[in-house]
Amino acid sequence: MTKITVVGAGSWGTALAMVLADNGHDVRIWGNRSELMDEINTKHENSRYLPGITLPSTIVAYSSLEEALVDVNVVLLVVPTKAYREVLQDMKKYVAGPTTWIHASKGIEPGTSKRISEVIEEEIPEDLIKDVVVLSGPSHAEEVGLRQATTVTSAAKRMEAAEEVQDLFMNSYFRVYTNPDIVGVELGGALKNIIALAAGITDGLGLGDNAKAALMTRGLTEIARLGRKMGGNPLTFAGLTGMGDLIVTCTSVHSRNWRAGNLLGKGHSLEEVLESMGMVVEGVRTTKAAHELAEKMEVEMPITAALYDVLFNGNNVKDAVGSLMGRVRKHEVEAIPDLL
């Protein structure tokens, strides 16, 4: 039995805490809403973020980060990307020794465009880091909460660390593969949110299956293009954290990013969409970060650029579709010649 603290009591953090508790681990979960932590402890439910799911009674919730981290050497971070530095700066005051830092957040840090593992390594002193591991893949919290079959990937620079995390999570309904490509796994999980927003827009506009299939396929090309430039393995983007996560996020009503895009496609403003969602839509911030990265690294990402103009420059969604369809003719695979 391993002592694990889950930092972040949203839908995904709560679902992963359930998986770990089902596996017999000593699981604590921290959140900044004391009434929500009280509900988890007394009613064994997170009615705000994962309603209708009865949580194992062994999960103990804390609103004090200091108390949640006592005698723990494995932490699972599941907080919005914009909150990472602030949370990590608090956490390092209370972590006593070398710790395995797992993160399951799919995004890029706003402002710096850095991957979350890079943020962890910048904020946490070396003597407090045993390993940094990423957990990512096609995984809606709602389905994991129902213990429906789910498969994800554990990635770390040190394969033994990825395998240790694999062992922590594996059970009859939650399968975990390993991958040494931490860059590709993080980028696949983050960048697919951009394409999911765009897929939601195509559905909101009623453009049909042909358009959506093309968008997802060309979107995956963009993800792989930037991922390769940043050091990711092209094969990673054909796996669970690339194609797999892209499919589930672009086609499911559980997807916040798809739902947000769908509302945009139906004519709602970004402000209206974000207000109505009530939860973080990482794809909005990730679009900005990826657009900045693409310009800096001179990587062609036309779908990302078109979505950026819709979100941040007020471009009309129909005009964005027209601009993509009217681009100069191209060879389909010219951008990824080493895959031929």
Curated annotation (Swiss-Prot):
Positions annotated to bind NADPH: 11-12, 33, 106, 141, 256, 280, 282
Any one GO molecular-function label of the UniProt entry: NAD binding
Binding-site residues, sn-glycerol 3-phosphate: 106, 137, 139, 192, 245, 255-257
Lineage: Bacteria, Bacillati, Bacillota, Bacilli, Bacillales
Entry protein name: Glycerol-3-phosphate dehydrogenase [NAD(P)+]
Pfam family, one: NAD_Gly3P_dh_C
Entry function: Catalyzes the reduction of the glycolytic intermediate dihydroxyacetone phosphate (DHAP) to sn-glycerol 3-phosphate (G3P), the key precursor for phospholipid synthesis.
Catalytic activity: sn-glycerol 3-phosphate + NAD(+) = dihydroxyacetone phosphate + NADH + H(+); sn-glycerol 3-phosphate + NADP(+) = dihydroxyacetone phosphate + NADPH + H(+)
Organism whose genome encodes this protein: Bacillus cereus (strain AH187)
NCBIfam families per UniProt: PRK00094.1-2 (NF000940), PRK00094.1-3 (NF000941), PRK00094.1-4 (NF000942)
